[in-house]
């Protein structure tokens, strides 16, 4: 039975890896209220993008850096660091091409927070994080990634055991949204996009990362255990406190 589950998960992972937003009619997917789907947006840049907008390609080295940073934090938290409880079944996060394509489409609007839907045919309620940069000179892509990760990492001072057990966006000392999303055990995949542009004398950038699921208000961020990964079918060799990438976790199922 275990081998069947793992095989099914591997097949689904391959589909996720090679899905593209051009193959799906996102305009037909349901959205809440009057919201519209980011995949239904015109592929051209919005007027908010100023001068010389450019969507940057995230190369393998950039994708690996994002995954490494996220999985480092997940591994650290899963073992009970920062005074947080141990995670029973938190897996290694992998890259998702479809989520990345939707993130790229979102950044072409050059506005961080919107009411756009990001759901796919298989991922019903993706989460997302935005990082906006403004300065005299545009940093290298790696520097933008590191700055975005640092912003989320600083939220370790705000997140508490109580938030892990019953999610909310803010702790006693501030926002926890970015970090809490990165360590959700329902998150199995991530995909990011980056657009840069010139706004007068200022160089600007928007880095958006879509995650396979989002935290639900009042529900656990992750399931707590007595030892790291005690509920994993197989532990990862590199991130030893996490389940392997083949762990069959359903991102659509709430804790």
Curated annotation (Swiss-Prot):
<comment type="similarity">
    <text>Belongs to the CRISP family.</text>
</comment>
<feature type="domain" description="SCP">
    <location>
        <begin position="67"/>
        <end position="211"/>
    </location>
</feature>
<feature type="signal peptide">
    <location>
        <begin position="1"/>
        <end position="23"/>
    </location>
</feature>
<keyword id="KW-0800">Toxin</keyword>
<dbReference type="InterPro" id="IPR034763">
    <property type="entry name" value="P14a_insect"/>
</dbReference>
<keyword id="KW-1217">Cell adhesion impairing toxin</keyword>
<feature type="short sequence motif" description="Cell attachment site">
    <location>
        <begin position="32"/>
        <end position="34"/>
    </location>
</feature>
<dbReference type="GO" id="GO:0005576">
    <property type="term" value="C:extracellular region"/>
</dbReference>
<comment type="function">
    <text>Inhibits platelet aggregation induced by all agonists tested (ADP, arachidonic acid, the thromboxane A2 analog U46619, thrombin, and snake venom snaclecs (TMVA that activates platelet through GPIB, and stejnulxin that specifically acts through GPVI (GP6))). May act by competing with fibrinogen for binding to glycoprotein IIb/IIIa (ITGA2B/ITGB3).</text>
</comment>
<dbReference type="Pfam" id="PF00188">
    <property type="entry name" value="CAP"/>
</dbReference>
<keyword id="KW-0964">Secreted</keyword>
<keyword id="KW-1201">Platelet aggregation inhibiting toxin</keyword>
<keyword id="KW-0732">Signal</keyword>
<protein>
    <recommendedName>
        <fullName>Tabinhibitin 7</fullName>
    </recommendedName>
</protein>
<keyword id="KW-1199">Hemostasis impairing toxin</keyword>
<dbReference type="InterPro" id="IPR014044">
    <property type="entry name" value="CAP_dom"/>
</dbReference>
<dbReference type="GO" id="GO:0090729">
    <property type="term" value="F:toxin activity"/>
</dbReference>
<dbReference type="InterPro" id="IPR035940">
    <property type="entry name" value="CAP_sf"/>
</dbReference>
